[in-house]
Swiss-Prot record:
Belongs to the UPF0246 family. PANTHER family: PEROXIDE STRESS RESISTANCE PROTEIN YAAA (PTHR30283:SF4), PEROXIDE STRESS RESPONSE PROTEIN YAAA (PTHR30283). InterPro entries: YaaA. It comes from Agathobacter rectalis (strain ATCC 33656 / DSM 3377 / JCM 17463 / KCTC 5835 / VPI 0990) (Eubacterium rectale). This is UPF0246 protein EUBREC_1226. Disulfide bonds: none annotated. Pfam families: H2O2_YaaD (PF03883).
């Protein structure tokens, strides 16, 4: 069973704590992406990154000294977004690190697929960015089915905790043999259920922590998740979609 999760824009360098286990599986493809990015001007990169001048300058400076092989941070500690804050890997026990290393895969526009203990360096690139490398018209074409092939295992079970921008990389290549379960976090707004981005990100990270703490191997056990005020809604769920509703006091 594999769990897929989106990356975060905000990243840090932490070379003082855990040492990465290995390099990302598609590091050669990442080097190709990096060369393409380095060939662009500041203004072109600002448009690709869709950011203000300050963030563009910060990332442009990063590019000049970017090293894919040295001073790396384990991926699960490098990302600082909401989902990763609620996953709280910095306080994982050894068994929980082992669980996420075996089961969690972080999808990335720059690296393709990351195991939690793969060594990474901070970057800025989203899957929807207007990037044309070689014959590929965009990053979805560039990565093709590589993300799916890296994620699928002998169980053929994938738990989707990723955003649509990233889950698309997997969904296009699913086969009838695969069991693909999307986890949906929602809450009542008026007379309908809606997904609120910040709460959903919090819940995705908390779900990974819940699965790691409970060593979950059977998708049915995911339904026991009851953190952050969420409860499983069996009446709204199916074999391919688990719906959790946040009860607002």
């Amino acid at each position: 069973m594999k769990i897929i999760l989106s990356p975060a824009k905000k990243m840090i360098v932490d070379t003082d704590n855990l040492v990465p286990v290995e390099l990302p599986v598609y590091i050669d493809k990442t080097a190709e992406v990096l060369n393409w990015i380095k060939s662009k001007s500041k203004e072109e990169l600002k448009a690709i990154w869709k950011c203000n001048d300050k963030i563009a300058e910060q990332n442009f400076n990063r590019l000049e000294n970017m090293d894919l092989y040295n001073r790396l941070t384990p991926a699960v500690l490098a990302y600082e977004g909401i989902a990763f804050q609620y996953m709280a890997p910095s306080v994982f026990e050894n068994s929980q690190f082992e669980y996420v290393q075996n089961h969690l895969r972080i999808l990335s526009a720059f690296y393709g697929v990351l195991k939690p203990m793969d060594g990474v360096t901070p970057y800025r690139l989203e899957m929807q960015a207007k990037v044309e490398i070689g014959d590929a018209k965009n990053l979805y074409e560039y990565w093709n089915d590589m993300l799916y092939r890296s994620v699928i295992d002998e169980s053929r079970i994938i738990i989707n905790l990723a955003s649509k921008e990233y889950s698309k990389c997997i969904e296009k290549y699913l086969t009838p043999k695969d069991k693909y379960i999307t986890i949906s976090f929602c809450e009542q707004a008026g007379n309908k259920l809606v997904t609120k981005g910040t709460y959903a990100k919090m819940a995705r990270g908390e779900m990974v922590r819940f699965m790691a703490e409970n060593d979950i191997e059977n998708p049915d056990d995911i339904k026991k998740f009851d953190r952050l005020g969420y409860i499983f809604r069996s009446d709204l769920s199916s074999d391919s979609k688990y719906v959790f509703e946040r009860k607002i006091a």
